[in-house]
């Protein structure tokens, strides 16, 4: 079964079975050839935490291949994580990829406990790169979808560095949209529009 067909199926399931923003497309784990996870610790997502993946990544780069490398690295002997660390990943073209199970506690290389955090990462290094318009738009739509689907308040939207003194993640060029409340305001607007339908 090819990747395009799987993505179409996943999109249809999202349309029929979910109540979040309707234009959202999430590529399933099979799209990037995910390995099966190891046994994991469960949690209930209660807040949204934004990351950047931390490596320079451009629109022309192969996102599925890179995501697979991130999973392989994370599950390797140096980290020994149960899966890719994030619940969702967004590439610079605005494509969204399913990461680990949302009800699995995510991973971090810093000191904060990610239990209860739904981890969304934007692919790139936003200390050095700007966030693309497509990536920012996809991030806002995905957060609104997750807030709606998992009953998470937009007031919980924060970043990795808000919980850890050991990192600048998600980078100054993404963090500025949290500092000025742009992301939170846009998410709240999407949720308000949905509530009026």
List PLM regions with ranges.
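Secreted/periplasmic proteins that engage bacterial cell-wall peptidoglycan
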Residues: 41-102
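Hydrophobic h-region of N-terminal signal peptides that target proteins for export
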Residues: 10-18
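Basic/polar, cationic surfaces and motifs that engage anionic cell-wall
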Residues: 18-53, 92-108, 113-197
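Generic cytosolic/nucleocytoplasmic N-terminal low-complexity/intrinsically disordered segments
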Residues: 1-2, 46
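Sec-dependent signal peptide recognition
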Residues: 2-9
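Short polybasic/polar patches that bind polyanions
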Residues: 14, 75, 148
